[in-house]
Design a protein with these regions (language model features):
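N-terminal acidic, proline/glycine-rich, low-complexity intrinsically disordered segments
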Residues: 1-5
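A structural signal for multi-pass alpha-helical bundles of membrane permease subunits
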Residues: 6-8, 15-16, 23-272
């Protein structure tokens, strides 16, 4: 009797386990399908960069994702043509993105520290006023921003792309809210020991907010790297362009938006 009961329980275990984990299985399958859907454009772009121009033009005929004939001619063209100095663009993009990220981390963390920890008159009103003004779309400030860069004689130079992006009210808001979880007792103890505001910021606040600073750094770097509109306006010399508007120049150098040759070469530049 006992042996029969144990055997029956063992046989029922897989079914019971399946019922208990049905929700997790469905969620896993849904996320797997979602991941495939999100990855397909990336896979298609990378694979298409190895296609010939003729095959790219005949995509609707073959409907193939992987190339019929693999070739690296698109990468050879991107690296060899004088009209598209892609290594210079990549260098400019790294300079702009890294410089902007460092400045964003310093300015937003110190601003958040001041708004959250220091006491001064009208700080809440100032913060929420600036936060409200940030709700306007960025395109509203393009003309004043252009005039300011022109007055500083920074147009067509990398500083004109670096400095307009070093502020970010959302990042200040993010760091400030994270700072609320850091006990103020640490500040008070350091203050009793004779530490000033800058020492408290450097030795206590910064080590405590490393997780949110990592997030802000990722936002700042990817935002600067992917920026297209403002670098296209501020930079006119092809050698001074960053990578994103440079890819547009690659399309123009290929003679417009028609055909498939320039498409696969743009994809090669994008993959690089």
């Amino acid at each position: 009797m006992t042996h029969s009961t144990v055997t029956h329980t063992r046989k029922a275990n897989p079914s019971a386990w399946f019922r208990r984990n049905l929700g997790k299985i469905i969620a896993f399958l849904f996320m797997a399908v979602l991941a495939v859907v999100w990855l397909m454009p990336l896979v298609w772009a990378i694979a298409s960069s190895f296609k010939t121009s003729m095959e790219a033009k005949q995509y609707l005929k073959y409907h193939n994702i992987l190339p019929i004939k693999w070739t690296i001619e698109n990468y050879q063209y991107v690296f060899s043509t004088a009209t598209t100095p892609i290594f210079q663009w990549m260098r400019n993009s790294f300079i702009v993105s890294i410089s902007q990220t460092v400045l964003v981390l310093f300015l937003t963390s110190t601003s958040a520290y001041a708004y959250e920890r220091l006491q001064f008159r009208g700080k809440e009103g100032i913060f929420w006023t600036v936060f409200g003004l940030s709700m306007f779309p960025n395109v509203v400030g393009l003309v004043p921003q252009f005039q300011l860069m022109n007055a500083l004689r920074w147009l067509d130079k990398l500083p004109s792309v670096i400095f307009p992006g070093v502020t970010g009210v959302f990042n200040i808001f993010l760091i400030r809210n994270f700072l609320k979880s850091v006990p103020k007792d640490l500040d008070e103890a350091a203050s009793i020991d004779g530490a000033g505001a800058w020492r408290i910021y450097y030795q206590i606040i910064l080590p405590s907010i490393k997780p949110v600073l990592t997030v802000v750094a990722l936002f700042a770097f990817t935002g600067a790297w992917n920026d297209f509109v403002w670098p296209s306006i501020a930079l006119t010399n092809p050698k001074n362009l960053t990578l994103t508007p440079g890819l547009r120049l690659l399309q123009v150098s290929e003679g417009g938006s028609g055909g498939g040759g320039h498409v696969v070469r743009q994809l090669a530049g994008g993959v690089i």
